[in-house]
Amino acid sequence: MRSEQVLKDYYSGKLAQRIQLRKLELAYPPQPENEVKIRVSESSVGDPTEREVLSRVMDLRLATLERRLMCVEKFLRECERVDQRILHLRYRKEYQWVKVAMDVNYSRRTCIRRHNNLLIELSKYLAWEE
């Protein structure tokens, strides 16, 4: 996944939303129905809990989304204050580059250059995912 799309998903809240949806999918998996409606139950007392824990541990999709979220948060913590502001204005508030530049008192070109450098740095954080 491209680093710019990861930032868009993070700032729009889609990344956190995907994590919550995946947790719900794991907590309440779809029940397969057969024509006879026979329910096979296991006698183990802790089995539902055990299944839930194992499915969460083994779920690669959820782990990938959570790692992506942690990587973005760590990346943003380590960024300079002005770079955080540029990303916030660009992705959270969806400002055009001219308005971002006016807000941080840099030229439009400098903001774009810093943004491009940030995307390269973020892609290094996310490199192990791909």
Residue ranges and their predicted role:
Residues K93-T110:
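Helix-turn-helix DNA-binding module
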Residues M1-F75, K99, W128-E130:
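N-terminal interaction/assembly modules
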Residues N117-L126:
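C-terminal flanking helix
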Residues E78-Y95:
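Short amphipathic alpha helix immediately N-terminal
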